[in-house]
């Protein structure tokens, strides 16, 4: 049902976009995404399969997160061109497909269905972001080639294109490694992260919100289905948490800093992936989507483009609501109680300890402590003496979304049991 709704709205708005005003297309896109989300919730815990397309618990949890990010993105954007909303809708369709299949050919189609709109969205404001978007496109094409080659080797090793087919030997291991490279690019795992800082810095802030939340959720849904070698996952965890956190320390622009932060968080998610616990990964992603979405929603009200760190100074004095919301987002990303980010990291780290992955666990703990320097620096900057920069508060609905995300982060921090049973039923 979710697939049908997204497909119908995508095709219908492609045809009607030329006659409807842009705001009409935006409202219709929001309606389509909301209906897709409602259908997902109404069928929660009820598996469905049709050929290679299969809705299961993993699909439902990660599609939910992707749709939340898509709704937030469309709500924040004020574009005079209807194509923007169509691109988000088509990307959301690709994300749902990616999360809802084990078949490598359909997975490849889904990857391209979500990637092509993202390349266009990254170049939406031409000029400073064009070079970064070109890098994103070229590296994305290379990652797709790795994935395709991995699928071919997987078929050669197992005689099947369905993930989970039994296999062994060096050809099978190489196939899984190449699939991991292709999906690791979308998840922004180091060392496949080189596009992330430039694209985040050069793209419009709502587009960055979409990339940092929805795309990451869909990528990890696919990664969860790939039985990647534990040694390879451990290496990706180590590289991501070290590169992401250390590089973030030297940044002077907020979106670029959060890009490196997202690389580090991809490493923590990969730690949950390493243990094979879908519930821990799903909860971590939920808290990450809420906190990261909240941070970028605040940044989008400061500037739709680049946001130097100085622009955050004194935000609380200019707008107490946005200042407090940004502080909540930073503290949740850091993983401090009583916010939801604490339980996300706790579940991932506890599962790693239970699995005996002490090496990567210690590294994750140390780098998480290092991240306190820049998260607290960003969060407390909002209380400093304000810079003399123009500031115009966003519309009421955007502020309401900020409040809702902040309240959810606090509520899930105090009562994580509100969603853990549902995630267990889904995952």
UniProtKB/Swiss-Prot annotation:
Q: What class of enzyme is it?
A: translocase
Name the membrane topology term: Multi-pass membrane protein
Q: Which domain of life is it from?
A: Bacteria
Gene Ontology cellular-component annotations: plasma membrane
Q: What is its EC number?
A: 7.1.1.-
GO biological process entries: ATP synthesis coupled electron transport
Keyword line: Cell inner membrane, Cell membrane, Membrane, NAD, Quinone, Translocase, Transmembrane, Transmembrane helix, Transport
Q: Which residues cross the membrane?
A: 1-21, 30-50, 57-77, 79-99, 104-124, 137-157, 172-192, 204-224, 230-250, 257-277, 280-300, 322-342, 360-380, 400-420
| GO MF annotation terms | NADH dehydrogenase (ubiquinone) activity; NADH:ubiquinone reductase (non-electrogenic) activity; quinone binding
What is the first-listed, main subcellular location in coarse terms?
membrane
Name the reaction it catalyses. Answer: a quinone + NADH + 5 H(+)(in) = a quinol + NAD(+) + 4 H(+)(out)
> Could you say which protein family the record assigns here?
Belongs to the complex I subunit 2 family.
Functional note: NDH-1 shuttles electrons from NADH, via FMN and iron-sulfur (Fe-S) centers, to quinones in the respiratory chain. The immediate electron acceptor for the enzyme in this species is menaquinone. Couples the redox reaction to proton translocation (for every two electrons transferred, four hydrogen ions are translocated across the cytoplasmic membrane), and thus conserves the redox energy in a proton gradient required for the synthesis of ATP.
What name goes with this protein? NADH-quinone oxidoreductase subunit 14
Q: What is the lineage of its organism?
A: Bacteria, Thermotogati, Deinococcota, Deinococci, Thermales
Gene of this entry:
nqo14
């Amino acid at each position: 049902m979710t697939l049908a709704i997204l497909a119908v709205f995508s095709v219908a708005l492609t045809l009607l976009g030329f006659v409807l005003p842009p705001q009409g297309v935006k409202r219709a896109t929001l309606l389509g995404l909301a209906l897709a989300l409602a259908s997902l919730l109404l069928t929660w815990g009820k598996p469905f399969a049709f050929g290679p397309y299969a809705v299961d618990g993993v699909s439902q949890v990660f599609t939910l997160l992707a749709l939340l990010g898509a709704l937030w993105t469309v709500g924040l954007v004020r574009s005079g061109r209807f194509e923007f909303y169509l691109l988000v809708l088509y990307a959301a369709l690709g994300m749902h497909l990616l999360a809802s299949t084990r078949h490598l050919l359909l997975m490849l189609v889904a990857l391209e269905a979500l990637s092509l709109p993202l390349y266009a969205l990254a170049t939406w404001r031409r000029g400073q972001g064009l070079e970064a978007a070109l890098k994103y496109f070229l590296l994305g094409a290379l990652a797709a080639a790795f994935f395709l080659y991995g699928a071919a080797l997987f078929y050669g090793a197992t005689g099947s294109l369905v993930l989970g087919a039994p296999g062994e030997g060096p050809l099978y291991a190489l196939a899984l490694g190449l699939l991991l490279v292709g999906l690791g690019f979308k998840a922004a795992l180091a060392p496949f992260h080189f596009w992330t800082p430039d694209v985040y810095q050069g793209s419009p802030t709502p587009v960055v919100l979409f990339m940092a939340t929805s795309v990451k959720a869909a990528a990890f849904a696919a990664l969860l289905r790939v039985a990647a070698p534990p040694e390879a996952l451990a290496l990706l965890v180590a590289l991501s948490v070290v590169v992401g956190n250390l590089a973030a320390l030297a940044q002077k622009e907020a979106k670029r800093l959060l890009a490196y932060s997202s690389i580090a968080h991809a490493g923590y998610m990969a730690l949950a992936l390493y243990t094979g616990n879908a519930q821990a990964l799903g909860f971590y992603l939920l808290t990450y989507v809420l906190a990261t979405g909240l941070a970028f929603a605040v940044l989008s009200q400061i500037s739709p483009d680049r946001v130097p760190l100085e622009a955050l100074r004194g935000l609380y004095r200019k707008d107490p609501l946005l200042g407090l919301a940004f502080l909540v987002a930073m503290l949740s990303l850091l993983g401090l109680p009583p916010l939801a980010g604490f339980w996300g990291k706790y579940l991932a780290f506890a599962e790693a300890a239970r699995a005996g992955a002490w090496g990567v666990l210690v590294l994750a703990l140390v780098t998480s402590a290092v991240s306190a320097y820049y998260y607290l620096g960003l969060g407390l900057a909002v209380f400093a003496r304000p810079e003399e920069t123009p500031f115009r508060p966003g519309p009421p609905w955007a502020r309401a979304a900020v409040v809702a995300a902040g309240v959810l982060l606090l509520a899930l921090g105090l009562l994580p049991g509100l969603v853990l049973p549902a995630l267990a039923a889904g995952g």
